[in-house]
Design a protein with these regions (language model features):
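Positively charged n-region of N-terminal signal peptides that target proteins for export
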Residues: 1-4, 18-19
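C-terminal motif of bacterial Sec signal peptides marking the signal peptidase cleavage site
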Residues: 13-16
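N-terminal "mature-domain start" segment
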Residues: 19, 25-34, 49, 58, ...
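Signature of long, low-cysteine stretches enriched in small and polar/charged residues
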Residues: 22, 72, 79-128, 232-293
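Secretory pathway targeting signatures of secreted, lumenal, and periplasmic proteins
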Residues: 22-27, 44-46, 177-236, 244, ...
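Solvent-exposed alpha-helical segments and adjacent loops
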Residues: 23-43, 47-50, 98-162
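N-terminal leader/propeptide segments of preproteins
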Residues: 30-93
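Surface-exposed amphipathic alpha-helical segments
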Residues: 131-153, 180, 294-326
Length: 326
């Protein structure tokens, strides 16, 4: 009996210690912070002012395709290692430069806060660091951008919409916040919009017959023709005879991607209000729903004259990438 009691006390002691250690570690991992699309770069001033700094800016400040004016993918805040402590370590996205180390790159999560992505680029010389940056430029951007999309989705999920009609009519769910309102709806089309200080952010959601898009060399032209016809039918401007269309002077970008584990076409470009003076960027995803023999199209477009549109477009992409098809 004495042995059983002693064993029980030992077990409870270790469990208690484990819980204390767990709670102690959790207290050290605080919530991350920082503005959307802002990356902290931790490196010495002289490195930042030289060729390594130029290479970092070439990776992180690359202009985003599909915006009316050049905007960098990320805003960069350079921080010397000597002052990288306390609150400044809590930024959601951090790039660290380590000299006099083995050449390489490390992708870590939740090092100083959560959620957080920390990328460390190392090299024995500055030239090696530059090589690592250039060899991994796309992966670095993708890692940070995915983190920002996830963060925007997390923020928007705090106040989700409650429009059951989208699920009922289109057999899908999409996670936009409650500040959006339905501007127009039919049996197979929804126009959702949100008022912002300088204009509006907008979403179109609709479905097409499976035969509407054929995978051949004219894919981008097919997508543009469809969006223009849908825009003319459903999105009218304030001026009589004006409607949503694609700006012909700007070549659209098209790429293959995956949305909701299904093949999809991603198209970026500039929209205009035909016969009026309005325009802005759009991002369009046509999802191939083989099970239900249809295409589901979700497009985000922004009207925000005289202000940067990068963060608005990230919100559009973040919303669209929450879609779940039944």
């Amino acid at each position: 009996m004495r042995y059983i009691v002693l064993s029980f006390i030992c077990v409870m002691f270790f469990v208690s210690c484990g819980d204390k250690n767990k709670s102690k570690s959790e207290r050290f991992i605080q919530d991350s912070s920082g503005a959307i699309n802002n990356v902290s770069v931790v490196t010495e001033n002289e490195i930042w002012d030289g060729r390594v700094g130029e290479a970092i800016r070439a990776v992180l400040a690359k202009p985003i395709y599909g915006l009316p004016q050049d905007e960098p993918m990320f805003t960069i805040s350079q921080i010397p290692p000597a002052v990288f402590s306390g609150f400044v370590t809590k930024n959601r996205t951090v790039l660290m430069v380590k000299l006099n180390r083995e050449k390489g790159i490390d992708f870590s999560e939740n090092v100083y806060a959560k959620p957080q992505k920390v990328i460390t680029v190392s090299g024995k010389t500055r030239e090696e660091v530059i090589e690592v940056l250039q060899e991994n430029d796309a992966k670095i951007r993708e890692t940070f951008r995915n983190a920002e999309i996830a963060e925007r989705q997390r923020q928007m999920a705090k106040s989700p919409h409650s429009f059951e009609s989208i699920k009922e009519k289109l057999k899908l769910t999409v996670g936009f916040p409650s500040v959006y309102r339905v501007a127009k709806s039919t049996d197979n089309f929804f126009w959702i919009r949100k008022d912002i200080t300088t204009g509006t952010t907008n979403l179109m959601i609709f479905e097409l017959p499976y035969s509407a898009i054929k995978r051949n060399d004219s894919l981008v032209n097919q997508v543009i023709k469809i969006r223009d016809s849908v825009g003319k039918l459903h999105i009218e401007g304030g001026v009589e005879g004006s409607y949503l269309a694609t700006e012909e002077a700007y070549t659209p970008y098209l790429a293959e991607t995956i949305i909701d584990n299904k093949p999809a076409l991603e198209t970026k470009g500039i929209w205009e209000l035909r016969n009026a003076f309005m325009g802005g960027p759009f991002i369009n995803y046509a999802i191939e729903d083989k099970i239900n023999k249809r295409w589901v199209v979700l497009e985000g477009f922004v009207f925000a004259p005289s202000v940067d549109k990068r963060n608005y477009m990230l919100e559009m992409e973040a919303i669209i990438k929450t879609v779940k098809l039944e």
